[in-house]
A protein has these predicted regions:
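Active-site-proximal, Lys/Arg-enriched surface segment
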Residues: 1-90, 195, 199-203
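An internal, acidic/charged active-site-proximal segment
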Residues: 95-203
Length: 203
């Protein structure tokens, strides 16, 4: 359904980097018999009060077409993916241990992060088929995708750019002569931002 959009819009992305914005969105529902519908945070809630809404959750991706390079308009976002990623329904109180075990395994395989990883692989494959095998796919998302699952399975010739908490604990890989996997020195994005020893460029 979305492949023709990607194929035709790729001609307007002459640079080596091809940007794709990824985010999850919600669709309100009122029927209680919809299996995939569940109560979730209402994004329109005021900051001082959390509201819940019954609805479906979708994962969407939009190709960022840099028209500002050739025309007087800004970047345009064209939809290239829209798929449902509602969560697995929790078993009831009378569920057996086997049902609870199956639920825990299903949650690990069918969640927002796993859906993002599979979608990223599909987008990389479709970009190659559209003639963009020499381009770098840049996936941009919010903090929902700043986790080990998403960073651990980035497709080849792809980059993941996400927003991180300013107090997140980060570290580099340990040196090759160490038995550790992660380095001992830790830092946060806020410390990097305030580091006077780093030169920042405004683009």
């Amino acid at each position: 359904m979305f492949r023709p959009i990607l194929k035709r819009a790729l001609a307007y992305c002459p640079q080596r980097l091809v940007g794709v914005a990824v985010d999850d969105t919600r669709l309100r529902k009122t029927g209680r018999s919809i299996p995939q519908a569940f109560y979730q945070r209402d994004p329109l809630s005021p900051p001082f009060h959390l509201n819940l809404m019954l609805g479906l959750r979708f994962l969407q991706a939009s190709l960022l077409v840099p028209l500002h390079h050739t025309t007087s308009v800004g970047t345009r976002a064209l939809p290239i993916r829209f798929q449902e990623v509602s969560r697995i329904k929790r078993p009831g109180k009378k569920a057996t241990e086997e049902m609870k075990k199956q639920y825990r395994e299903a949650v690990k395989q069918r969640n927002l992060s796993r859906s993002f990883v599979e979608m990223a692989k599909q987008l990389r494959q479709e970009l190659d088929q559209a003639g963009g095998s020499d381009k770098i796919l840049v996936l941009a998302g919010d903090g929902s995708f700043c986790n080990r699952t998403c960073f651990g399975e980035i497709p080849e010739r792809s980059v993941l750019l996400v927003r991180a908490r300013k107090d997140a604990k980060l570290c580099f890989r340990a040196s090759t002569d160490s038995r550790r996997f992660y380095g001992v020195d830790k830092f946060t994005p806020e410390q990097v931002r305030k580091d006077d020893g780093r030169n920042w460029k405004t683009t």
